[in-house]
Each structure stands twice: as C-alpha cells, then as structure tokens.
Amino acid sequence: MAKNKRLTAAQATVERNKPYGLSEAVALVKSNAKAKFDETIEISLNLGIDPRHADQMVRGLISLPNGTGKTLRVGVFARGPKAEEALAAGAEVVGAEDLAEKIQAGEIDFDRCIATPDMMALVGRLGKILGPRGLMPNPRLGTVTMDVKGAITAAKSGQVEYRAEKAGIIHAGVGKASFDEAKLVENINALVDAVQKARPTGAKGTYLKKAALSSTMGPGVRVDVASFEA
C-alpha cells in the first residue's frame, strides 16, 4: 500500500501529456525517486524506425561522461594468455567450453559478454540464449576483440549498450537518482547524440519521435525532444 500511495503522490506532480524541458524533467524524476535504494534513472526513446528491416537497426555502445553508477559484471570467452588478461583486468567470469556449459545450464552471471575472435565458433552456438538477452558479443560493438583488457575497462567505466526493440523503442539507464542534475543531463545528451548519429539509412520521416524519463519506482515524465542538445 505504501508503494501505491507513494506512486500516486508522485504521479500527481507530473502532467501526464506535457512534454517537459530536459532539465525540468530530470528535476521532476529525481524529486520523485524516494525509494529506500538509489533508483536507476532510465530514458525511453521512441524512434521512427522498423527494426524488423535490416537497414533500420539501431544499436551501439557509448561511454557516458559521468558513468552509470552501476558496476557491470563481465563474462569473457578466452583461452590461455587472453584468459589471464581478462582475469587481471577484473572480469568476473572467464572460460571457454566450461563457460559455454554453464550458460547452457542457465547460469548467466554477467551483464556484458566479451569474446576473442577465435572463440566465436563456440560462442555462436549460444546465440539463441545470449541473443535475446542482448549479451551476444559483436565486433561492431567492440565486444569481439583481442583487446580484452580495453573492452573490460570500457564496460566497467560506464559504458552503456543501446538497442532498439521490435517497436522501435530504446530503453537505457543513464545514471542514478543520487547523481547531480547536471551530470544526468550531460549523460542523457551524450546518449541521445549517439542515437542520433546512429540513424540508419532506411529511416524515413521523423527519427526521434518521443522521449520519456523515469526512475525505477517513479512515474514516467515526457521530455520535449527539442530540448536535447544537438
């Protein structure tokens, strides 16, 4: 009941169909993040694309200027010296066939998956498990690489993966409620800029149609797309 009352009270502070300027939206979302834990601030971007078409996919990685406030657990497929490099760089899970067996058994104890190129024949067999979870290593995202240390460091330093879902919507965490408003605004503008630059050639008409911000337990707040920094 307390949660429902808190959400109802928070919703009363937000005009449902009003698009707010970015700074005002961030302030509203922060003020309504009153849970006992540090809530994640998430942005939703509604894009004018149809991801079912290969030429309208939007996906990428960006290192947010102020990090995400979340420590990612990293899994790495590698052997020999590269496996040792991964462990030294702070990867939580490192392996080859043994790691594949754990994943097939449902043990997926990581948020980002990295692989050296020679491991992709093995990793490819896990596509039906890793793909739907957004964990499949991808050379275009820098997660299939011989620079294992660099990829792990980037993942742990506030790197965010964004990917448009079937409806053309991107959901991404941009920080924590404890962040200063200015840092959240900077992170959001950086993410939106990356998404804008990733506009696919097949996209027609208005690309960035709608945007909204919310905290883990708070109501959504519409954001005026014109208020993002170009």
Curated annotation (Swiss-Prot):
Signal peptide: none
Keyword rRNA-binding: yes
Gene3D superfamilies given in the database record: 3.30.190.20, 3.40.50.790
Keywords assigned by UniProt, alphabetized: Repressor, Ribonucleoprotein, Ribosomal protein, RNA-binding, rRNA-binding, Translation regulation, tRNA-binding
GO MF annotations, alphabetized: rRNA binding; structural constituent of ribosome; tRNA binding
A Gene Ontology biological process term: regulation of translation
Subunit details: Part of the 50S ribosomal subunit.
PANTHER family attached to this UniProt entry: 54S RIBOSOMAL PROTEIN L1, MITOCHONDRIAL, LARGE RIBOSOMAL SUBUNIT PROTEIN UL1M
Function according to Swiss-Prot or TrEMBL: Binds directly to 23S rRNA. The L1 stalk is quite mobile in the ribosome, and is involved in E site tRNA release.
Protein's name according to its UniProt entry: Large ribosomal subunit protein uL1
Organism: Gluconobacter oxydans (strain 621H) (Gluconobacter suboxydans)
Upper classification of the organism: Bacteria, Pseudomonadati, Pseudomonadota, Alphaproteobacteria, Acetobacterales
Gene name, Swiss-Prot/TrEMBL: rplA
